[in-house]
Structures are given as structure tokens and as C-alpha cells.
UniProtKB/Swiss-Prot annotation:
<dbReference type="GO" id="GO:0006412">
    <property type="term" value="P:translation"/>
</dbReference>
<dbReference type="InterPro" id="IPR008991">
    <property type="entry name" value="Translation_prot_SH3-like_sf"/>
</dbReference>
<comment type="similarity">
    <text>Belongs to the bacterial ribosomal protein bL19 family.</text>
</comment>
<dbReference type="InterPro" id="IPR038657">
    <property type="entry name" value="Ribosomal_bL19_sf"/>
</dbReference>
<protein>
    <recommendedName>
        <fullName>Large ribosomal subunit protein bL19</fullName>
    </recommendedName>
</protein>
<dbReference type="InterPro" id="IPR001857">
    <property type="entry name" value="Ribosomal_bL19"/>
</dbReference>
<keyword id="KW-0689">Ribosomal protein</keyword>
<comment type="function">
    <text>This protein is located at the 30S-50S ribosomal subunit interface and may play a role in the structure and function of the aminoacyl-tRNA binding site.</text>
</comment>
<dbReference type="Pfam" id="PF01245">
    <property type="entry name" value="Ribosomal_L19"/>
</dbReference>
<keyword id="KW-0687">Ribonucleoprotein</keyword>
<dbReference type="GO" id="GO:0022625">
    <property type="term" value="C:cytosolic large ribosomal subunit"/>
</dbReference>
<dbReference type="GO" id="GO:0003735">
    <property type="term" value="F:structural constituent of ribosome"/>
</dbReference>
Amino acid sequence: MQQAPVIHEIENEYLRKDVPEFRVGDTVRVSVKVVEGTRERIQDFEGVVIRRRRMGVNENFTVRRIASHGIGVERTFLLHSPRIDGVKLVRTGKVRQANLYYLRGRTGKAARIKERRG
């Protein structure tokens, strides 16, 4: 039982401090560092957060967006990964579920999420 506080203390060193507060249903823009050969560039991925899992260093979230020709694309990111350059909150959404898997079967206006006010 002595291991848990030590692990917790070590993990706290690797937590990011610059992550904004966001929830499931919010629209976020995630900037990811992409390495192509010797070059490194930033690639943005914007979409709706459909899931958040775990806590601490292992916390991750899934973002869904509709790409060209109406094809849905989902990417899962580790929140505290060094590959993530930043997360920007674009829009807040009002939802009542913890996971928005039902959006996978919806397209167009049926996939809209109301905006949370205040």
C-alpha cells in the first residue's frame, strides 16, 4: 500500500498545467505535433468531444468530426501527452450523457448539439 502515494507523486510531475477545462459535448481544437522525416509540424484536429476516460497521466479523450464527403473521423488523444501542443475550447455543448456514441449513427442536422450558456 505504500506504493500508491509514491506513484501518485511521480505522476504529478508529468501532468500538464495548460489544459483548459472542457467536458463531453464541447467542441475543441487539438494541436498535434506531427513528425515527417526530419521535419516537425503542427496539425489541428477540430471536433466534438464524445468521451473522456481515466484520470491523472492516463486521462484520454476522443474527438469526432465529419470529414469530406460526410465520413466521420474519430481520434483518441492522451491529454497529458508531449505530442499534444495544445487544446483550445471552441464551443461549449449542452448534453446529458457521459458518452456521445449515438452521434456515430447520425449525420447532418441530427448530429447537432445545443450550446451551453453561461
